[in-house]
């Protein structure tokens, strides 16, 4: 799959080779990839204003900080609506990762869930609960999380709930969608077209399903998504935007070819 100038899916042509001289492999992630996916995410966001606010003690308790990222990656992978992908160098090193969720109660969403199979869904359900319990017990044994500013985490979670309802929950027409939960790429590999290749995976799926893609863009990531044809629905809540980068970053949406857009983009 390749993308046209306006970011629409062009399924008739193959993607161009990355400008990097080293071949990059995009493949479906496995549960064994979760630790390295988490470490990549933790490294990418380590010095951002938001991370500094949420995890001010991450340097002193780096192992706990890293575990947050690993646990989140694995928890998402144990949801049957999730699809996770990694970008690997020719040596097999994971240099980037993306996680997407197929949301909604439409026929396409349920078809995908059924295709996973009953046994696998049961395994994922049991594994998710076991993993949740394991994480709770481990944090308790360690005396709780020492990396976080708990008040900041609770405040940020409340902002996320407000924005989630404002841009997604209150819009029935946006319920059926692919949602980009995470896209991370090691700094030394950025600017080489790898992020575009990872996003092409979900854009092809959304084009095939005839549904939109939604995501929360960081200040730095907004440029990439704009180039891919995403449109800005609105900035994060004022406080969240200020923490991120002077009001930059926000909720973005992508429409597949032939999709009838909403009559109004009002938030």
Where are these regions (language model features)?
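Conserved acyl-donor/pantetheine-binding loop and adjacent beta-alpha core of acyl/acetyltransferases
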Residues: 99-184, 190, 239-246, 258-265
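Conserved active-site alpha-helix within GNAT-family acetyltransferase domains
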Residues: 196, 208-210, 219-236
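Conserved catalytic-core motifs of GNAT/GCN5-like acyltransferases
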Residues: 231-251
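Conserved beta-hairpin
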Residues: 80-100, 184-186
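Conserved GNAT acetyl-CoA-binding A-motif
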Residues: 176-178, 206-217
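Active-site rim helix/loop that mediates acceptor-substrate recognition in acyltransferases
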Residues: 56-84, 89, 163-169
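Conserved acetyl-CoA-binding loop-helix of GNAT-fold acetyltransferases
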Residues: 185, 191-204
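A short beta-loop-alpha structural element at the N-terminal edge
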Residues: 25-39
